[in-house]
Amino acid sequence: FGTCISGCTDQSATNYNPLATQNDGSCVFPPCTAPAPTHETFSTGLMPIGVCSPNQWEISATTGDGWRFTGNPGYNASTFSGNNRSVGSFSWIDFSGTDVDPVLEVEDIDVSSLTSSALFFDYFSDLGTSSCAANNILHVEAFDGTTWNSVAVLQLNATGWNTYGYELTGFENGTTAQIRFRGESSGLSCDFYNDLLIDDVKIEEAVYGCTDAS
């Protein structure tokens, strides 16, 4: 009846054995990444579906319901107030309850095709006419293969939506960008006035030039 040769029979595996006649379960697959440039618009009202099915985007929280993808934020972040974007077209944290370490992790991005990778995103942190001594905090972090490192910390009050960009050189895990957004309360009892929103998350080529409008 011939000789059975055990080994990996899946051609997409890194240890594929073309001589194997029986799969022994030893297949090893390369890590799945989405190729840069990428652009997430949060337009479905659901957590994004990543390139690596079923879903490489992740959310987590120590306490609270964490990042949301639908529903209407409160106070000036409401779509009926200072926020001019439609419900279900951005991601946000509701600080009306207790939220600790709400994390939104972006799918892994292969940046090997970029000369200098950068992260861009739109951010909304606007108290409007409400009063609070300090705004809630957005931590932007990158994983280098060992630990999460701080790319930026945003604790600010700015009118409406604003775009922020950060070069990722030195923050990558080899040729992979692993990014997460972590929101934290200011710790003040008035933190519920300041829901935090993000939109249009992009990882693409860094753009250099003069940024002084004067």
Place the predicted regions along the sequence by residue.
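Extracellular carbohydrate recognition
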Residues: 97-103, 131-132, 186-205
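Extracellular beta-strand ligand-recognition surfaces/modules
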Residues: 42, 121, 165-191
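Extended, low-complexity, turn-rich repeat/linker tracts enriched in Gly/Pro/Ser/Thr and Asp/Glu
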Residues: 111-115, 124-134, 187-188
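Extracellular beta-rich ligand/substrate-recognition surface
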Residues: 90-102, 154-159
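Primarily marks secretory-pathway-exposed extracellular/lumenal segments that are disulfide-
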Residues: 1-51, 110-111, 116, 193, ...
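Extracellular glycan-recognition surfaces and repeat-rich motifs
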Residues: 35-93
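Short beta-strands within extracellular/lumenal beta-sheet-rich domains
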Residues: 95-114, 163-165
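Extracellular carbohydrate recognition and processing domains
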Residues: 147-172
